[in-house]
């Protein structure tokens, strides 16, 4: 049974948001260059000072709505300071996953990071360790063979401010995700550390529905908690069918969840996650990017149920409205088109995360101000919209939902 004392409690996308984890953009953003943007999954380089102001505005908007804001970087520092052995193990693992499992470069990086105060060490790991920050003896074969045209020994993590993706809260537990691309794969190590060692979360019987030690990819932007027993997952560029099956199997075996809806979307950079094209904004209202639907309003869907033998029963469909109404017990359903359905406007505003709303209560959402047509469409459908400035933070291809990891929501009235 779920309890009010559980540090993680998320049974919907729309229940009043009580606690969220954010990451304030840091020096990792300024370590992007034109040559590294592509591998690090960016299309442009945000102006850090303005990006920080915009992010602070986002955090303040949440606080004014009664949301407790926790910062990932502070949680990581607090977790590391609980035990020197935990800190040493984390450093060793982070260096190994940065490409140096052993050898003199590993040893030099370890010496460098251990010598920093914990808060500076965490900032440095997130920002990246440059080649010229470490003394490497050229006579050593590993050092001699290292490609010195690479600016970083440990690459920066500029996507960290999208805290949604490395993990996802579901019920009284979470998934800690195996990220798709190497540029983001280390990010879920921070979640793993915090859940296992931070006093707020450690030894609190939090269910980990799927950990990061898998090959099949899974990202939180594809995981949408539609109710206390229904989960939607995007089959996308960033989440595989194998991972969806894993999550369904584990939820069916250990939770109240009995339905997983797999929604297939185009596997492109613009539509990397389900929440870039589809989000829940009220009990019976959803945003949807019209491009993912064919001219009949259809797209491929698989509905997975737990049968009486605890096996997975799969049904196929192509009607999003019908599936949502049936699985959520709704008589009516309102799909609100990004860009108010205009093909040019919807494409432009979806690129700038017009579909990526963060619900802070039923019928109340946070959005980017730049998507003014989509915002007005939401208002026409009775949704309360709180807009935040977004000229720089939007350059990372993520919106308010992407930038937030809810860990506690109030249950919604049935």
UniProtKB/Swiss-Prot annotation:
<keyword id="KW-0378">Hydrolase</keyword>
<feature type="active site" description="Amidino-cysteine intermediate">
    <location>
        <position position="402"/>
    </location>
</feature>
<keyword id="KW-0056">Arginine metabolism</keyword>
<dbReference type="GO" id="GO:0019546">
    <property type="term" value="P:arginine deiminase pathway"/>
</dbReference>
<comment type="pathway">
    <text>Amino-acid degradation; L-arginine degradation via ADI pathway; carbamoyl phosphate from L-arginine: step 1/2.</text>
</comment>
<keyword id="KW-0963">Cytoplasm</keyword>
<dbReference type="GO" id="GO:0016990">
    <property type="term" value="F:arginine deiminase activity"/>
</dbReference>
<dbReference type="InterPro" id="IPR003876">
    <property type="entry name" value="Arg_deiminase"/>
</dbReference>
<protein>
    <recommendedName>
        <fullName>Arginine deiminase</fullName>
        <ecNumber>3.5.3.6</ecNumber>
    </recommendedName>
</protein>
<dbReference type="Pfam" id="PF02274">
    <property type="entry name" value="ADI"/>
</dbReference>
<dbReference type="GO" id="GO:0019547">
    <property type="term" value="P:arginine catabolic process to ornithine"/>
</dbReference>
<dbReference type="GO" id="GO:0005737">
    <property type="term" value="C:cytoplasm"/>
</dbReference>
<comment type="similarity">
    <text>Belongs to the arginine deiminase family.</text>
</comment>
